[in-house]
Amino acid sequence: MSTDVSGEPKVATVDMKLEVVTIPVSDVDRAKDFYLSLGWRLDADFAFGKDVRAVQVTPLHSGCSVTFGSGLTTAEPGSAQRLELVVEDIEVARDDLLDRGVKVSEVFHRDGGELLPGPDPERRSYLSYASFNDPDGNGWLLQEVTTRPPGRVWED
């Protein structure tokens, strides 16, 4: 880690944003159909020669997109796990996915290290979840966040 002249760690001063996460899939068209069925925006679908194809989709209002295709990664299809999507209401989000034909787990919450059924009784942020997989088994986790604590919101 780099330090300043006093030996303290340097604080990042360059604005960097996570733009894209690449997930491995076995069937590009099947994956594209699945993610579009979630209501995600299609940003790009193009080929580079005959061996590389890239599809980019973005969840509603997300600052980060998801890319998949052929020739993009050596990871095994289905090996991406715990890809987290933040939602304001876990039950509404789960119902929306069910209405779209997605197989979604029941809502569960964390109490200490234990996972229990249903949303967090106090509906505290970061503690209620539901999970689903894409057709290849890449694992997604819905996480309910209603309030971000200080330090988790960027100040300009």
Language-model segments: which ranges?
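Residue-level recognition of conserved beta-strand positions in structured domain cores
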Residues: P59, F68-S70, E144
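Core segments of cupin and vicinal oxygen chelate
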Residues: T13-M16, T22-S65, V92, D99
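Short hydrophobic-acidic sequence motifs that mark active-site Asp/Glu residues
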Residues: K17, S65-T67, G139-L141
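Acidic di-acidic motifs
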Residues: D27, D89, D134
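Vicinal oxygen chelate
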Residues: M1-V14, F46, V55, L85, ...
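Short, solvent-exposed beta-strand edge segments and adjacent coil->beta transition regions
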Residues: D15-V20, G78-R82, L127
